[in-house]
Amino acid sequence: GILGLAGVYFLDYRDSGMPGSADNEHPRALFAQPVNEVAENVVCYIRDLKPDIVLTFDPIGGYRHPDHIAIHDATVIAFDRADDPIFAPNAGETYKPRKLYYHTFSRAFLRVSMRLMRLFGQDPTQFGSNKDIDLESLAAVSFPIHAKINIRSVLKKKEAAGRCHASQGGMQMQKGLRGLVSRFFGKA
């Protein structure tokens, strides 16, 4: 594949929608699952793959997506308990990754995006294809930054991979205002 990954792994839950979406009513919607059950499934992958670093969403799920918040919560538990033989005892040999990182959007990127949106007559409190993302509320929350990765050298590869992900905007994510700002910051 485009990214050269050794594997892609799924937890076999159904995608939820943003708050208020009918998709959230599905019994297999990720955000509706017991957090410890999801954490046990994540522990299975941690123990099997033995990563040095575990990466998950920030505590607000990037843009307040219920699934992103749910997987954040489960991943934090899994990271903390992957070396506990009592937690998920059938999930393989215990293992402790060295570090846990959260992906978070650059607040400077969000602030510039909001200014540009207003300049072009767009409402930053109604972002996204469903107009259900409030960039102002996201920019108001900040998290400590412990590591930054400049992706300019791999931005074209990241964009190509993003074009394959139709449910996340596909080609639309590299067009228009977001694409312009993303290329300027090197953060698509």
Locate predicted features.
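Metal-dependent de-N-acetylase/amidase catalytic core
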Residues: S21-N24, R28, A32-A188
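A conserved beta-strand->alpha-helix junction
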Residues: I2-G20
